[in-house]
Amino acid sequence: MAGKRQSQDPVNAIKVVASTMLNSFLEDLKEKNVLNKQELQTMGQTVNVITKKTENLVGDLTEKTQVVGKIFKDHFLNSGSLLSLKSHAENEDECSESSSAVLQEIQASQVKVRKLCPCDHSHEPKITNVHEIYPVMEKEGRTRLALIICNSEFDYLSKRQGSEIDILGMQDLLENLGYSVVVKENLSALEMKTELKNFAARQEHKFSDSTFLVFMSHGTLDGICGTKHRNEEPDILHDDTIFQIFNNRNCRSLKDKPKVIIMQACRGRGDGAVWVTDVGEASAWTCDQPLQCYIFNDAIEKTHVEKDFIAFKSSTPHNVSWRLNTDGSLFISHLIHYFREFSCCHHLEEIFRKVQNSFETPNTMIQMPTIERVSMTRYFYLFPGN
């Protein structure tokens, strides 16, 4: 069988397929009275040239009618199936039973690849398996929602000047990514919780493939500050509250769909910097007590309570996040820039890492964004324009 494969010239095999396609194509033109006899004879004389140099085919037909274009399109697309079938036929002794299934899988993959957004950047989406990415719904009939909560006015804390720039920037970004954006401003922790519950209950999520939750406010290590916050009486929206409202137990409409949380807020008063020498000693935390693990399972249905989340925060724990009264927050401005630059060809976590990399070299305003509480099981590509 190996000798049979070597004796067959693959170039000639492709020419045979191309010639067969063209002959069938010309017959259809004749039957439908698109070309007369003289024109058919003229085209017939060029078949050999077309077979050897197929890129001239389109040029030979551009002056014909739309009917010619439609017939050619049908035959040209079917040629991919002919080539695929011929390739599988060479191994029919070894895998005749599975060839049709493999072909169907390849064709299904090709259909999905055609739906990817065109990327003006030099890199194409690096997708090796369509099952490794979150499904993206068709634009028609899809109802993506995003929520922005921004607190700029507080009863006891300073005004967050420049926050209006962050709102406009994030709203424009998310709308261009296909999300209808809900904006809420100046809420207490209780009011934020109420708005989150209302947003989680929106019926549009049933016909959506993902959601974004954006929080911009003063903050502490414990969470996002509400408008009534002060040291004596904390007004804090905790991370756990957000995750609980949108987990699979309480928000079924977003089950198995990416839920992206973005937080612009301080997480302490530290500046996030330390002076180090070129050579240092590292210390490790130790514990005298042995690690004990107890596993319990209270779930009623066979699904993870918390899954498909990712949180991107503007700074590391205990440290500040910087904001300019004229340009808005550094984190938000960098985030918007890299989303616009790379969302067509990189998945979400890669974009987040590019934002982190932009903060890698410390300068006057030091902060390091962090990716936290990740439970996403696939790559999330945004495919802008789709």
UniProtKB/Swiss-Prot annotation:
SUPFAM superfamilies: Caspase-like. The modification Phosphoserine is found at S84. GO terms for molecular function: cysteine-type endopeptidase activity. The active site is at H218, C266. Involved in the activation cascade of caspases responsible for apoptosis execution. Heterotetramer that consists of two anti-parallel arranged heterodimers, each one formed by two subunits (Potential). May interact with TRAF2. Belongs to the peptidase C14A family. This is Caspase-12. It is an enzyme of class 3 (hydrolase). Pfam families: CARD (PF00619), Peptidase_C14 (PF00656). It comes from Canis lupus familiaris. Its EC number is 3.4.22.-. It comes from the Eukaryota. The keyword Phosphoprotein applies. Keywords: Apoptosis, Hydrolase, Phosphoprotein, Protease, Thiol protease, Zymogen. SMART domains: CASc. GO terms for cellular component: AIM2 inflammasome complex; IPAF inflammasome complex; NLRP3 inflammasome complex. Residues 1-91 form the CARD domain. GO terms for biological process: apoptotic process; proteolysis; regulation of apoptotic process; regulation of inflammatory response. PROSITE patterns: CASPASE_CYS (PS01122), CASPASE_HIS (PS01121), CASPASE_P10 (PS50207), CASPASE_P20 (PS50208).
